Amino acid sequence: MANKTKKPIYPFEDWVIRETQFSIDTNYRNETIFTLANGYIGMRGTFEERYSGPKNTSFNGTYINGFYEIHDIVYPEGGYGFAKIGQTMLNVADSKIIKLYVDGEEFDLLQGKILFYERVLDMKKGFVERKVKWESPTGKILEVKIKRIVSLNRQHLAAISFTMQPVNFTGKIRFVSAIDGNVSNINDSEDVRVGSNLKGKVLKTIDKSVEGLKGWIVQKTQKSNFSYACAIDNVLVADSKYEVSNSLEEDGVKVIVDLEAEKGTSYTLNKFISYYTSKDFDENKLVALALEEIEKAKNDGFETIEKEQEEFLNSFWKDADVIIEGDKALQQGIRFNEFHLLQSVGRDGKTNIAAKGLTGGGYEGHYFWDSDIYIMPFFLYTKPEIAKALVMYRYNLLDAARSRAKELGHKGALYPWRTIDGPECSAYFPAGTAQYHINADIVYALKRYVEATNDVDFLYDYGCEILFETARFWEDLGAYIPLKGNKFCINCVTGPDEYTALVDNNAYTNYMAKMNLEYAYDIANKMKKEVPQKYQKVASKLNLKDEEIVAWKKAADNMYLPYSKELDIIPQDDSFLYKERITVDEIPEDQFPLLLHWHYLNIYRYQICKQPDVLLLMFLQREKFTKDELKKNYDYYEPITTHDSSLSPAIFSILANEIGYTDKAYKYFMMTARMDLDDYNDNVKDGIHAASMAGTWSAVVNGFGGMRVYTNELHFEPRLPKEWNLLSFNVRYKGRKINVKLTKENVVFALLEGEPIEIYYFDKKILLEKGEIK
């Protein structure tokens, strides 16, 4: 159901999302909202007892971050260097199944009567709990309470506590706890952002076993040659005799518990679930590892896992919580967004954060530049150890990036536009491989990480390789063009705005490449002086010559940086201003998003933007532009930006804040803050918009909080919205933890952890010391 009026869907509460009635019409959407994940395992909010509703009103998804199948990318008319192999994150076995039968009648929300229904996502304690009072078709009434946890502490573990109580009868009840490996990915959508390129079932069951209350299966992919084990164990908590039976299915296992239930007595089945994959562990040890995991969990007990979850989240919220007083909707929205970011992010250096997190298979589970530019800052300034893992992920892809550059005839490394673990998976090169700016985006994230943490060891041991290989690439990609005054030009590229493709001198790309080249030159020279042995080691490994480093500086110094004297703005690229200008107001509302209604040739023909391009550059390299320049470019590009990308509104909110367009700043912030929670685009059923969620944090901290990070300096120019009474957030920077609190009366900075530090409040320099409030 489209939420065209943008009305709130869930009651406003600080720490929970509450669903108060079950409806077929909203079920699909709610499966995304009530997803639980831990950066490794993701379980959509489907019901333990399964769902018998109509087709296309549910998708039962369980995902393991980075676990994928490969497939050939088929082109009717291919070409050299086209991406050949696709990767798709797989929907793996559903292990959360607990069916309930009462005297042979199946507990099913689409049968009988629902007398009471409530489902709660508790973001402080990290669980989903569902309470149902249900009357069977023959009049038996029972109360059911189901609590689910995907452990943030134990990445391979999930647990469910399923409690039932007969209200008006005594009779036979049966729990059926199962693993169902007969699964596939969504592939019936015409929206390229949603469907999968994998057709039908791709996982083959190669081993399975069930004994007593315990069972497991092992499944293997057909082409990527990965396997995984899923194991379950069950504990019945009841003062009652029970009988256990079980069965092996073609692609799964069932554990059946039968008992006599008395009226008014509660019976609980606790289920412990574990997944291990051959991507990370020896294939022959997967079952043993999964069984060991659930054995430990069973011995510790469900309550221990609950307690661990709350403690983990308590630590997270101490750093990451943003407090807003004066708008309960936004308070709930930003916490929901941050909670899902934490759930979605890989923390092992081998995985990243997919565009849809672990809530759905949209975009095939691929990682994009979103994680480097939009998502990285949230973790960098709240949980820097997670930011480090994201940068390490890029280092671990470096060999694949080198191979891609070589394939395309270039030196150095070219990172894939979309991938899971290395190869380019974007089949549409004009909005894929041509977005070379991803190289500089990754370096920008690396640079920010090093500046914010002082982790020079990471830079010298790992990051410098990324830096030098990407600089090599830029110097090789560009050329000195006589008719451009012998400036260094980068031609035939696509910038962040995907509604303009294959252009010369995209401003964002050129400025970011210049930054990349300059940083590489500076770090190479710094390493020569400060850590000569480490420099020699990396120079030898990369066969790096001094003349290359000089060439980087020359390219950076001579970089062509577009500017229009006539309009006094930065043109998006060499051709952009020579196209017909069309404003968003001129396009009928039913034509959005344009990519689903217009041929790309028609889109490329106009001055029309999917998302900020020049304006994103101005945000990322804010110190290079005056406020007047920012305003002129904002005024030019805003009317022609469709915001068809969920990445768009947050940047517009931040910049509008600085310019003084306070109403626009708030409007754009509202577009991003509850985009998924209120299902603004009628597509949250397909999964969250992870980068937009991170953009919410940026819109608060960089927008209303006015935080800018210049080289080794924290600046604040806060502006509390008139709708709010208070805004409070924390920032981790260079080993310090700083609290920023805005009220209508004043702004207060407090150093909570670390050594004294100087910050800037507008143009005023302030020395913060621990224990002092300024």
From Swiss-Prot:
Regulation: Inhibited by Cu(2+), Hg(2+), Mg(2+), Mn(2+), Pb(2+) and Zn(2+).
Keywords of the record: Glycosyltransferase, Transferase
pH dependence of activity: Optimum pH is 7.0-7.5 for phosphorolysis, and 6.0-7.0 for synthetic reaction.
Coiled-coil residues: none
Known pathway: Glycan degradation; trehalose degradation
Signal peptide annotation: none
Binding site for substrate: W369, D370, K610, Q611
EC number from the UniProt entry: 2.4.1.64
UniProt record, GO biological process: trehalose catabolic process
Enzyme class: transferase
GO molecular function, one term: hydrolase activity, hydrolyzing O-glycosyl compounds
Catalytic activity of the protein: alpha,alpha-trehalose + phosphate = beta-D-glucose 1-phosphate + D-glucose
Thermal behavior of activity: Optimum temperature is 70 degrees Celsius.
Superkingdom field: Bacteria
Function field: Catalyzes the reversible phosphorolytic cleavage of trehalose. Phosphorolysis is specific for trehalose, but D-xylose, D-galactose, L-arabinose, D-fucose, L-fucose, D-glucosamine and 2-deoxy D-glucose can act as substitutes for D-glucose in the synthetic reaction.
Similarity comment: family membership: Belongs to the glycosyl hydrolase 65 family.
Assembly: Homodimer.
This protein's name: Alpha,alpha-trehalose phosphorylase
Source lineage: Bacteria, Bacillati, Bacillota, Clostridia, Thermoanaerobacterales
